C-alpha cells in the first residue's frame, strides 16, 4: 500500500469499496478494490480470496488489467487493477440521454466481450455476474470485463448449480435450479447488449415472481428498427431459453455479420503487439554512416542481448549503407577492438596493414566480387571468432589489423604520420578515399614481411638485388591470398634494421644490419611467393633460440635501444601476434651466420630506413 497514493473513492458496494490511487513511481492511475473480510460469512471470504487468485492469473486485452494484490491486516483483500477512464457501461447508457448507440460501436463492443468470455470459458471459468455495471470502458472506448467476485472454476462436467448473480441478468436454467454452464454467461451478455441497444433493461419487474415469469417466457420488447436484421437476430439468439440451442461465444464470433469487426479487432491487437515489442538492433544504415575514427576508446550503447549480426555482415547485407553519426561509428570501433583481442587470443596473425592513405569501399554488384581482399595468416588451427569480410556481397577491403610499432614501415609511410597510428582506431580510420574496390585490391605503401620456409634461404643473391632495384618503378600489383601464402606488390620496400649507432665507420655489424634489412625481398616484377609452416615446432624452436641469442648479444654489447625494440612485442597487453618478432629474430640469426656470403657493395645500395 505504501507504493500507492490515495486520490478518491469512486465506488462502494455491500462487500467493500473502490478507490482511485496513483502509483508513486509509475505515476499511473489504478483502482484499488478493498473487499472487507470482517463480519462476513465464510463463503464471502472464500469468494474474495478466489477473486484475488483468479484475476492474478488472467491475461487478456479485454479483461481488466491486474497489477497487484495482498491481504491487509487480515481484514481486507486488496486488489489493484487497471483504471478505466470511460467508466462502466451503465454510466455510459445514462449519459447517452436516450440517443441510441451506432450499430458499428455495439458490434465492436460485442466482439470484444465475446473474445473475453471465450478466453474465460476456454479456461473453464464462469463469470456468473456479467452485467452493464461490470463492463468498463477505457479512454479509447474499448471494453474491459471486470468484477470476478462470483466467478467459478468449473469441474470436469462444466456445470454448476449455485444460484448467484444479479436477478435481471439471470438465465432461465439458473432460476429453475437446473445445473448450468458457460451458456449462462451468453444469456447475461445478451441482456447487456439488449440494454445497450434499447437503453433499457431486457427484463424488469416490480417483484421477483414477475421477473422470473418474464425471463422464463422470454418476453422482451423488439429492438429499434434502426438496427439491422442480422444484429437483432444475434441478440435474439443469445436470449434463447433452451441453453442447448443458445450459441456459444465461439459460435457467435463466427457469425457472418460480426466477421468484419472480428478482423478489425484482431488487426488492432496485432498493431498494438508490434508497438510493445522491444526495439530492434540499429539498422546498418545508421551504423555505417559517414564519420571519421578519431578516438580509440568510447562508451557506446550495447548492441543487444543476442548480437546475432556482426558489424561486417551488416555492411555486406546493406551495400548502400553510408556513414553518418560519430556515436554510431565509435560503437564500431569499440566492437572491432574486441574482435581483435579475441582473434589474437586464438593465435591469429594478421599480416596486412593499411597506411594512412585514405581508402574507400566502392560498391559493386555480387557478380564482380571475385577477389577477397583480406589477408589473414593463421597460426595453428583456424580461429572461428574472427569476423571475415563477406565475400558474397560488397566487401570492404579494410580489415581489423593489429600491427605494432615493432613492424617497420617505409620512409614514405613515416612521413604520413604513421608513427602516431593507433591500432584500434586506425582499422577503419579513413574510409573515404575514392577508387578502391574488391576488384582492384590496391594498398598504398604497405610494409609486408615475406616469411620464408625453414629450408629456404631468405637472402637475395647479388643478381636478385640488382633485378629488384631495376624494377623499383613498377607498382600497383594485385594482392592474392591463399591460406598461408603472401604475394607482395608495389614498389620495392627495403626494410633495414638499423642496429648500430655509428654507420659511417663501415663496420661488419653495420653491414650485417643492412643485409638483414634486405631480407624483405619484395620484387614487383616476379611477385615472389614465400611459404612457411607455422605449426612446425622445429621452426618455432629455432626462431625462439635465435631471438634469445640475439637478445643476449645486444645486452652484452649494451645496445639497449635496439634490445627494447626487439623485445617490445612481447610486452603485456599487446594485441599484435608475437610470431612477427620471432621470425625477425630468425632472420637476424641467419643473417649473422651468413654474413660472409653477402656482397657488401650491394648492401650499401639499399636505401636506409630507420627502425620505427
Curated annotation (Swiss-Prot):
It catalyses: L-seryl-[protein] + ATP = O-phospho-L-seryl-[protein] + ADP + H(+); L-threonyl-[protein] + ATP = O-phospho-L-threonyl-[protein] + ADP + H(+). Keywords: ATP-binding, Kinase, Nucleotide-binding, Serine/threonine-protein kinase, Transferase. The active site is at 129 (proton acceptor). It holds the Pfam family Pkinase. ATP binds at residues 10-18, 33. The keyword Thylakoid does not apply. Residues 514-527 have a biased composition (Low complexity). Residues 503-534 are annotated as: Disordered. Its EC number is 2.7.11.1. Residues 503-513 have a biased composition (Polar residues). SMART domains: S_TKc. Residues 4-258 form the Protein kinase domain. May be involved in plant development processes. Belongs to the protein kinase superfamily. NEK Ser/Thr protein kinase family. NIMA subfamily. This is Serine/threonine-protein kinase Nek1. It comes from Arabidopsis thaliana. The lineage of its organism: Eukaryota, Viridiplantae, Streptophyta, Embryophyta, Tracheophyta.
Amino acid at each position: 500500500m505504501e507504493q500507492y497514493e490515495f486520490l478518491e473513492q469512486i465506488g462502494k458496494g455491500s462487500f467493500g469499496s473502490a478507490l482511485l490511487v496513483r502509483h508513486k513511481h509509475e505515476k499511473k492511475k489504478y483502482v484499488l478494490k478493498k473487499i472487507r473480510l470482517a463480519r462476513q460469512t465464510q463463503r464471502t471470504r472464500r469468494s474474495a480470496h478466489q477473486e484475488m487468485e483468479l484475476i492474478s492469473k488472467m491475461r487478456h486485452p479485454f479483461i481488466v488489467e491486474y497489477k497487484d494484490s495482498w491481504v491487509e491486516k487480515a481484514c481486507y483483500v486488496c486488489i489493484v487493477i487497471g483504471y478505466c477512464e470511460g467508466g462502466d457501461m451503465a454510466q455510459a447508457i445514462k449519459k447517452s440521454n436516450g440517443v441510441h448507440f451506432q450499430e458499428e460501436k455495439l458490434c465492436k463492443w460485442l466482439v470484444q466481450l465475446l473474445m473475453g468470455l471465450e478466453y474465460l470459458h476456454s479456461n473453464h471459468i464462469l463469470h456468473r455476474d456479467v452485467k452493464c455495471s461490470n463492463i468498463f470502458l477505457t479512454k479509447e472506448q474499448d471494453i474491459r470485463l471486470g468484477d470476478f467476485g462470483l466467478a467459478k472454476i468449473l469441474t470436469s462436467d462444466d456445470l454448476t448449480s449455485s444460484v448467484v448473480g444479479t436477478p435481471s441478468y439471470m438465465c432461465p436454467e439458473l432460476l429453475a435450479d437446473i445445473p448450468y454452464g458457460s451458456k449462462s454467461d451468453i444469456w447475461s451478455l445478451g441482456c447487456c447488449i439488449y440494454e445497450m441497444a434499447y437503453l433499457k433493461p431486457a427484463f424488469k419487474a416490480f417483484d421477483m415472481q414477475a421477473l422470473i415469469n418474464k425471463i422464463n417466457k422470454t418476453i422482451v420488447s423488439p429492438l429499434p428498427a434502426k438496427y439491422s436484421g442480422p444484429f437483432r437476430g444475434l441478440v435474439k439468439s443469445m436470449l434463447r431459453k433452451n441453453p442447448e440451442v443458445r450459441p456459444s461465444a465461439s459460435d457467435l464470433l463466427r457469425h457472418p455479420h460480426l466477421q468484419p469487426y472480428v478482423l478489425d479487432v484482431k488487426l488492432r491487437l496485432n498493431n498494438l503487439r508490434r508497438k510493445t515489442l522491444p526495439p530492434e538492433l540499429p539498422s546498418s544504415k545508421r551504423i555505417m554512416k559517414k564519420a571519421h575514427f578519431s578516438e580509440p576508446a568510447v562508451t557506446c550503447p550495447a548492441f543487444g542481448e543476442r548480437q546475432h549480426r556482426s558489424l561486417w555482415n551488416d555492411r555486406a547485407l546493406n551495400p548502400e549503407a553510408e556513414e553518418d553519426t560519430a556515436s554510431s561509428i565509435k560503437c564500431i570501433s569499440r566492437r572491432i577492438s574486441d574482435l581483435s583481442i579475441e582473434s589474437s587470443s586464438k593465435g591469429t596473425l594478421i599480416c596486412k596493414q593499411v597506411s594512412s592513405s585514405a581508402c574507400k569501399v566502392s560498391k559493386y554488384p555480387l557478380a564482380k566480387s571475385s577477389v577477397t581482399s583480406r589477408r589473414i595468416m593463421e597460426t595453428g588451427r583456424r580461429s572461428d571468432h574472427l569476423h571475415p569480410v563477406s565475400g558474397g556481397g560488397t566487401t570492404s577491403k579494410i580489415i581489423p589489423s593489429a600491427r605494432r610499432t615493432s613492424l617497420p614501415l617505409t620512409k614514405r609511410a613515416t612521413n604520413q604520420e604513421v608513427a602516431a597510428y593507433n591500432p584500434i582506431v586506425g582499422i577503419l580510420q579513413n574510409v573515404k578515399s575514392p577508387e578502391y574496390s574488391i576488384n582492384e585490391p590496391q594498398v598504398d605503401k604497405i610494409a609486408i614481411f615475406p616469411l620464408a620456409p625453414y629450408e629456404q634461404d631468405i637472402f637475395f643473391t647479388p643478381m636478385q638485388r640488382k633485378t629488384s632495384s631495376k624494377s623499383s618503378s613498377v607498382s600497383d600489383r594485385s594482392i592474392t591470398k591463399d591460406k598461408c601464402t603472401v604475394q607482395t606488390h608495389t614498389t620495392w620496400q627495403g626494410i633495414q634494421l638499423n642496429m648500430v649507432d655509428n654507420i659511417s665507420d663501415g663496420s661488419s655489424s653495420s653491414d650485417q644490419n643492412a643485409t638483414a634489412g634486405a631480407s624483405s625481398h619484395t620484387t614487383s616484377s616476379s611477385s615472389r611467393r614465400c611459404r612457411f609452416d607455422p605449426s612446425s615446432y622445429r621452426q618455432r624452436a629455432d626462431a625462439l633460440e635465435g631471438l634469445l641469442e640475439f637478445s643476449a648479444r645486444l645486452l652484452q654489447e649494451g645496445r639497449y635501444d635496439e634490445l627494447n625494440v626487439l623485445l617490445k612485442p612481447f610486452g603485456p597487453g599487446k594485441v599484435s601476434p608475437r610470431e612477427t618478432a620471432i621470425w625477425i629474430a630468425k632472420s637476424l640469426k641467419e643473417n649473422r651466420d651468413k654474413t660472409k656470403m653477402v656482397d657488401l657493395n650491394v648492401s650499401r645500395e639499399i636505401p636506409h630506413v630507420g627502425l620505427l
